[in-house]
Amino acid sequence: SQVGPLGTPVRLGVIAATDEDPGALRGLGTYGFIKGATGYIAGAVVHGKHNLEDFGYLMERAILFATDLDLGTCWLGGTFTKSRFASRFGVHDGEEMPAVTSIGYDAEQPHLQDSTSRRVANSSHRLPWERLFFEGRFGTPLPPEAVGDYATALLMVRLGPSASNKQPWRIVREDERWHFLIERSFLNVPRT
């Protein structure tokens, strides 16, 4: 168990096929989005005020580690059968499993389904800078030339993946403070 930067305990682990049990991943349910994965990074987080932020932070750290090992990854938030993964991972009462990440070696040639999914999600297009980053308040775009040493970090935020390529994040710089916000759409409503 690890604790996220906002104080929520998070458990992460790997569910993997082995030479002794090559069928270990069968039946987990990814709705056909993942083929040939050798494993999944799964996790559980206790319910709480900042649980999703802490889960996301620690999951992304695990993904960066896997990427450093030359493994391909793919976040799965709405395209996996949570009950099957939760059962396999051992999610306890009072915990939830917001997402899993497939891990494995990237396919040499992308499949038709991959390119179709990317096209439907509009994955090759990103919102323009002025729709993501603001100076002082919404409606006042933050000029790229005004961010100095933060230019690369903000560019990476702009290029980063998001569910269905919605890019829901917005950043408002107010003097020396940076406010990170989520723009919710009718498809991305707050949890109750």
What are these regions (language model features)?
Residues 1-192:
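Acidic, surface-exposed loops and disordered segments
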